[in-house]
Amino acid sequence: CPENANPGEILHDFTNLPRLVGGINDNITKIIKKIYDFVFSVELIEMPNCKTANAVKLTTNVFRDVNIAFVSELSLVFEKLGIDTNKVLEAAKKKYNFQVHYPGAGVGGPCLPINSYQLLNTAKRLGSNLSIIESSRKINEKMPEHVIKLTADAFEECNKSIQNSSILILGISYKPNIKDTQLTPAKKIINKLQDLGAKIYIYDP
């Protein structure tokens, strides 16, 4: 049973969403199903084994990581073309089979980046190459640098120096409405701006 819960909605997820069940053998799987039936009466999706169950979680999380990298890279080009990426995505998601993802300052949290690197390391150990995932990780890791560049450009346009300037960071968690800051890209941005001499103030509503 791979852990699969959305931070901030853990109780709802455990009591409402279908759960994957896959043990090291059939007997273990039956025991796990009985425990779930006793604690959480939700739909159980039986997998052939625990390896397959974990592969489902890895696939869904890496899918998101890759697609966030895709739209983030698109946004860098659209920015130069004077195109509002959010307008593009809002229109695109009206198409029934388009799964919208949004660009940002990077990807953080305890799952997406780690799961991508987990798959990359596994593939490397097997002599395989997951080039799309590897490229996506590089894109997402670089996005904080773009935010810093945008900030520096804005100061330059205003004929101001970042050094000794006060900058307010609104939100440092890796996603809205949670207190978790694991691997948040905001930390890279904050550290770099502090290195440049900025006075950083943080507020996360």
Language-model features and meaning:
Residues 1-205:
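Structural/interface elements that position substrates and couple domains in central-metabolism enzymes
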